[in-house]
């Protein structure tokens, strides 16, 4: 299997032992983007990056992760210009707001259809980091499906730990468009088998973890293999790493 700059991260993810290789890639991309925005390069000071963060903003999850990263000044500077645009736009929409009737007549807008409400929903649903993650993950999926042609990589997929439910859905849908029929005939049965086998494996680990708290097991030896069963079980279901500490800038 020939490796090059695009395939290395995907191969590394499948070799990582993570419950979902795409969660591994997503975490790597997310941390890299946080570091890009607030890290030593101070991208938040570049006009083009600031213009984009002013436009896109950050979702709740990534606003918290940016705060946790530890560069409070960088966060403050980004919020300064973001607030300028936010106030300008709010003022513009507020000036044109017309209070809808409680029971609007036919053809009249409801309050949910008011431009200011539509604008506010769009602002809350937009995130600079989410956009970059989506773009990067699309490229990783494309690389993954290109690698499927390689017998050595297929073996990694067959022997892997499956995927989280979130990325499982993405793979099932994307494979339909990315793979020819000959490869889909291998892909779908393989993914479904590895998903089922590994869900059973994780369920067994959770059972083992819970059993250690049974009073009948008092004084028994703890099994280190199931110590992290709860966090791995959560990753399988939701595609997250709940045991990860906050990602912080280097001291």
Predicted region positions:
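Intrinsically disordered, low-complexity regulatory regions of eukaryotic proteins
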Residues: 1-162, 166-251
